[in-house]
């Protein structure tokens, strides 16, 4: 029963069931990433490191990735993500570590990190678009997503 659960649960969590009967070379590349993630979920490590997980993903893939991360976090697993996609980072993580030239140059809450322009530039990343717009129009409040930006004008 435990073996069956450890096999079936990752398949359902990652949303790959429709692709199980396909030849591996016929599976779309973005879905192949989820096959790999399913194996990781089955092994159930304490820490999961995802390197640029949103690269090549469409909206479904990004939403599915969020479900997988929620599942892992609910199981008490630590999820570490390496990403240049700051929209994704702002939406999914509370703590951000910024690295440049093999060194940690900033570490803290996203509300603080995304307003450190010099540190982000040093790491060759930009804050989320909503944060950039808020800064350009002079909104003093920390804005991290478009809904927060829209709410400033209601």
What are these regions (language model features)?
Residues 48-51:
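Catalytic Walker B motif of ABC-type/P-loop ATPase nucleotide-binding domains
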Residues 2-19:
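Conserved ABC ATPase "signature" region
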């Amino acid at each position: 029963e435990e073996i069956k659960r450890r096999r079936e649960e990752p398949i359902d969590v990652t949303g790959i069931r429709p692709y199980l009967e396909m030849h591996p070379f016929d599976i779309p590349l973005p879905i192949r990433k989820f096959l790999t993630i399913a194996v990781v979920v089955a092994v159930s490590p304490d820490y999961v490191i995802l390197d640029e997980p949103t690269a090549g993903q469409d909206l479904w893939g990004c939403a599915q990735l969020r479900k997988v991360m929620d599942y892992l976090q609910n199981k008490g697993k630590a999820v570490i993500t390496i990403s240049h996609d700051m929209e994704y980072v702002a939406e999914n993580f509370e703590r951000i570590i910024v690295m440049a030239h093999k060194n940690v140059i900033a570490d803290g809450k996203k509300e603080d990190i995304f307003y450190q322009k010099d540190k982000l530039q040093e790491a060759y990343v930009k804050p989320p678009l909503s944060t950039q717009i808020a800064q350009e129009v002079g909104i003093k409040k920390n804005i991290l997503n478009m809904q927060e930006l829209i709410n400033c004008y209601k």
